[in-house]
């Protein structure tokens, strides 16, 4: 009996050895590390331009979960819309970052690397102020075409496109559409999508999936990604970005002070003073309707008084919370269904809350936390603020106004309450990739997200191959040792 068992174990050991041999022979055909493909997107925002370089394994182009941020470069100077009076400078401002892209993307990949530019709210405002003006964009396109990449065009994104592409980016990076299974196959993710809130320099966007009826067709976007339908609500509020809000707020303060030579600003910290020309406030379509009859070269001295309650009164005037012809509205008569699920808030949302958490050392877990933090910032003198964060000197005077605005926008505007506010994650990145519309824009233009679900397939990943080899080795050794033991036992019993 022992001999028969030993024979079976020997056969098992031989089978395992054969399996190891086959795996090793099969591995001889395996390719080495995959080569990468690259894509470049220029995010031409209202306040600045950023260049993002993405990469993905060349053999995974039609899959997901594989695109990552390879590098990024912040362009020095303002956004391209600021160069309307000197368009050639807009193109020249990009040269440093494009030279970095030449180094970051392997030379042999340059010709196959798509290059796109998307301009957002700053250019949307410029087309309002000067509809025929395309000179800035033309100058930028001429610069981009002079580089050896595969230039795919430049476009001024609509506010809704900006919102939807940001939503796609966030959910793509967090694998809320599709994810890789244990055996290397792509499977539908069971996680719910999360909403996206973007707070840029000239506009703010809110985008989220909803099962509620969307009463205004302009706010409804139907998407089909990986075979799954998504009904998405989105809206972009032009003139509600950080920089434009600050201009509009100064206009309200000047109005309240009757445009005196010296103006008290409750949204600036006590001890901070600055001389401003009216042209720096009323040079935007967002403020031109409130332009006074004074010459635009008139200078006023604005002095901070650090009054949080009065600042909130002025910030509240930026919104219209009363007009609404729908069952639910956010503000300015815009329909919005009730917010639901988790949200991710990025751009200036993140920077504002990060300032509260890191510089002011205050938690932000509820609406009252955000309100209290805003009031604390407003009550802090300029000297105290500067001692806390000297490197933020340029933005420092405006954190009182910005944090007050973010509080009112989220609570009174988007209607987050004590129950729903904790569902907001204030983040800059997902993993190592920046959250924003740029990645979603590239994925759309390169057809990296198919409408249909990818065919189910399995791939023998390296880790699984190693585990399988180890299992075969352990099984073989166990079988051989057991067989030897049984044979020795059989011989000793026959003596």
Curated annotation (Swiss-Prot):
Glycans are attached at residues 62, 297, 418, 444. It is found in: Membrane. Its EC number is 3.6.1.-. It is a multi-pass membrane protein. Residues 26-465 are extracellular. Its main location: membrane. ATP binds at residues 201-205. Keywords: ATP-binding, Calcium, Disulfide bond, Glycoprotein, Hydrolase, Magnesium, Membrane, Nucleotide-binding, Transmembrane, Transmembrane helix. In the nervous system, could hydrolyze ATP and other nucleotides to regulate purinergic neurotransmission. Hydrolyzes ADP only to a marginal extent. The gene is ENTPD2. It comes from Gallus gallus. The chain crosses the membrane at residues 5-25, 466-486. It holds the Pfam family GDA1_CD39. This is Ectonucleoside triphosphate diphosphohydrolase 2. GO terms for biological process: nucleoside diphosphate catabolic process. Residues 2-4, 487-495 are cytoplasmic. It is an enzyme of class 3 (hydrolase). One of its GO terms (cellular component) is membrane. Disulfide bonds join 73-97, 239-286, 267-311, 324-329, 378-400.
């Amino acid at each position: 009996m022992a001999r028969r068992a030993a024979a079976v174990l020997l056969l098992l050991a031989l089978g395992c050895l054969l399996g190891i041999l086959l795996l090793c022979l099969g591995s001889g055909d395996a390719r080495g590390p995959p080569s990468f493909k690259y894509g470049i997107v220029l995010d031409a925002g209202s306040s600045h331009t950023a260049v993002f370089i993405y990469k993905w394994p060349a053999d995974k182009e039609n899959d997901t979960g594989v695109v990552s941020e390879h590098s990024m470069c912040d362009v020095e100077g303002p956004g391209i819309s600021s160069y309307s009076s000197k368009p050639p400078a807009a193109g020249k401002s990009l040269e440093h970052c494009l030279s970095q892209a030449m180094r970051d993307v392997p030379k042999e990949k340059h010709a196959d690397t798509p290059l796109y530019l998307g301009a957002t709210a700053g250019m949307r405002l410029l087309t309002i102020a000067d509809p025929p003006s395309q000179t800035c964009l033309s100058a930028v396109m001429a610069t981009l075409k002079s580089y050896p990449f595969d230039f795919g065009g430049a476009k001024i994104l609509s506010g809704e496109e900006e919102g939807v592409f940001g939503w796609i980016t966030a959910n793509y990076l967090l694998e809320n559409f599709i994810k890789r299974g244990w055996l290397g196959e792509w499977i539908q993710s069971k996680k719910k999508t999360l909403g996206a809130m973007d707070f840029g320099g000239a506009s703010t966007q809110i985008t989220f999936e909803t099962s509620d009826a969307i009463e205004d067709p302009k706010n409804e976007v139907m998407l089909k990604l990986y075979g799954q339908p998504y009904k998405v609500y989105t809206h972009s509020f032009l003139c509600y970005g950080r920089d434009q809000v600050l201009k509009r707020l100064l206009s309200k303060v000047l109005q309240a002070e009757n445009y005196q030579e010296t103006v008290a600003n409750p949204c600036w910290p006590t001890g901070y003073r600055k001389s401003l020309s009216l042209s720096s406030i009323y040079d935007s379509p967002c403020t031109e309707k409130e332009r006074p009859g004074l010459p635009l070269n008139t200078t006023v001295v604005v002095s901070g008084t650090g009054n949080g309650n009065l600042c909130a009164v002025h910030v509240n005037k930026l919104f219209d919370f009363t007009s609404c012809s729908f069952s639910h509205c956010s503000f300015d008569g815009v329909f919005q269904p009730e917010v639901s699920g988790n949200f991710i808030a990025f751009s200036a949302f993140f920077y504002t809350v990060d300032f509260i958490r890191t510089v002011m050392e205050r938690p932000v877990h509820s609406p009252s936390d955000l309100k209290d933090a805003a009031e604390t910032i407003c009550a802090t003198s300029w000297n105290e603020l500067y001692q806390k964060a000297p490197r933020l000197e340029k933005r420092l005077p405006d954190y009182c106004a910005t944090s007050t605005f973010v509080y009112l926008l989220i609570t009174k505007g988007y209607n987050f309450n004590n129950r729903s506010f904790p569902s907001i994650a204030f983040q800059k990145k997902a993993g190592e990739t920046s959250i924003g519309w740029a990645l979603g824009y590239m994925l759309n233009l390169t057809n990296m997200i198919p409408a249909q679900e990818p065919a189910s397939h399995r791939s023998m990943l390296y880790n699984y191959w190693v585990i399988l080899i180890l299992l075969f080795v352990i099984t073989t050794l166990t079988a051989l040792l057991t067989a030897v033991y049984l044979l020795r036992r059989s011989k000793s019993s026959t003596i």
